[in-house]
UniProtKB/Swiss-Prot annotation:
Coiled coil: none annotated. PANTHER family: THYMIDYLATE KINASE, UMP-CMP KINASE 2, MITOCHONDRIAL. ATP binds at G12, I13, D14, G15, S16, G17, K18, S19. One of its GO terms (biological process) is dTTP biosynthetic process. GO terms for molecular function: ATP binding; dTMP kinase activity. Disulfide bonds: none annotated. PROSITE patterns: THYMIDYLATE_KINASE. One of its GO terms (cellular component) is cytosol. The lineage of its organism: Bacteria, Pseudomonadati, Pseudomonadota, Alphaproteobacteria, Rhodobacterales. Belongs to the thymidylate kinase family. Keywords: ATP-binding, Kinase, Nucleotide biosynthesis, Nucleotide-binding, Transferase. Its EC number is 2.7.4.9. This is Thymidylate kinase.
């Protein structure tokens, strides 16, 4: 657990509704009087946002998987040291739209890189900082991919590099997130992301409540 605050990550396949749930949870917790910081990965700092533009745009073959991992990790170093860790030290609730679980899923399972190496790199880069709780928004891969591709249609910023990959890739990513939750149930909660946004928010709030009840925030 963060030294004083509470660190929540929201993970899931593309199109699972992470960004909307992050906003809803932030509003809900803010209404309860909690000091909430919302951030995202890759991103969260000017340097991280620049890296985001590099790795999420263009053709899939633009980056070697190892280069992709190192870029994501470089963004996370800046994010943790300049944003997440200071906010936790101030006793804030940090909600991140993606974190290291996505690296394990996309660059590990998806790209075939060693999970052990990714975990070692993460430990060195972040001081082995992991969320107090990760909410995994679970949705059929085909539904999520269709949602995500519709969202990207007409957007001026092209962040569709992963959406360009086939359904089998996204099914592997979904399985990877579920496997992470099964291995560490004390720090994960799987949320059914089907249904209305209000229904998903209610499920997420119900899963989060017992963890926050034990947190120093």
């Amino acid at each position: 657990m963060g030294a004083q605050g509470f660190f929540l990550a929201v993970e899931g396949i593309d199109g699972s509704g992470k960004s909307g749930i992050v906003r809803s949870l932030a509003a809900h917790l803010g209404a309860e009087g909690r000091d909430v910081l919302v951030t995202r990965e890759p991103g969260g700092t000017p340097e991280g946002e620049a890296i985001r533009g590099l790795v999420l745009a263009g053709a899939d073959e633009a980056w070697d998987p190892m280069a992709e991992l190192l870029l994501m990790t470089a963004a996370r170093v800046q994010h943790v040291r300049r944003v997440i860790a200071p906010a936790l030290a101030q006793g804030r609730v940090v909600i991140s739209d993606r974190y290291a679980g996505s690296t394990l899923a996309y660059q590990g399972t998806g790209r075939g890189l060693s999970e052990a190496f990714i975990r070692t790199l993460h430990a060195e880069a972040t001081g082995d900082l992991w969320p107090d709780l990760t909410l995994v928004l679970d949705l059929e891969a085909g539904i999520g991919l269709a949602r995500s591709r519709r969202r990207l249609t007409g957007e001026t910023l092209d962040e569709g590099r992963f959406e360009s990959l086939d359904l089998a890739f996204h099914e592997r990513i979904r399985a990877a997130f579920l496997a992470q939750a099964a291995r560490d149930p004390g720090r994960h909660a799987v949320i059914d992301a089907s249904g209305t946004p209000e229904e998903v928010q209610a499920r997420a709030c119900a899963a989060l409540a017992p963890f926050l009840a034990q947190a120093p925030v």
